[in-house]
């Protein structure tokens, strides 16, 4: 199994979980690197905070799904084909949760336009 297959879920999960946790606790400052990067969310500081407060839990959940998949790949899955299926399905789930986070953030941030 390739290193990318092993570490992509871990890296994506860690970044998503940390970003989600900081966002929902209102400790993620507006920046150019991390967070939900949508025009409406970035339109003001109030929109940024409201968007991340609303989307943070979903982003955190997606990160936990990806982290669990990464740990599962490292511990339980030496078979390459099974590992690829686990990584793909878990990352699809994590990306869907990130999509819900973006939708929730956009909805919350629109109140500040």
Q: What does each model-found stretch correspond to?
A:
Residues 18, 49, 53, 100-103, ...:
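A broad detector of short, well-ordered amphipathic alpha-helices
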Residues 20-35, 104-105:
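Membrane-water interface of transmembrane alpha-helices
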Residues 53-66:
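Select subsegments of transmembrane alpha-helices in polytopic membrane proteins
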Residues 67-72:
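Alpha-helical transmembrane segments of multipass membrane proteins
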Residues 77-112:
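C-terminal structural segments of small proteins and small subunits
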């Amino acid at each position: 199994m390739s290193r990318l297959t092993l570490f992509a879920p871990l890296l994506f999960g860690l970044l998503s979980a940390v970003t989600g946790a900081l966002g929902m606790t209102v400790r993620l400052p507006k920046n150019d690197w991390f967070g939900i990067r949508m025009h409406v969310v970035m339109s003001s500081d109030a929109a940024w905070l409201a968007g991340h407060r609303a989307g943070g839990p979903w982003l955190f959940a997606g990160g936990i799904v990806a982290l669990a998949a990464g740990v599962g790949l490292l511990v339980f899955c030496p078979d390459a084909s099974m590992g690829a299926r686990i990584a793909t399905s878990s990352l699809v789930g994590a990306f869907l949760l990130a999509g819900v986070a973006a939708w929730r953030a956009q909805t919350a941030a629109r109140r500040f336009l």
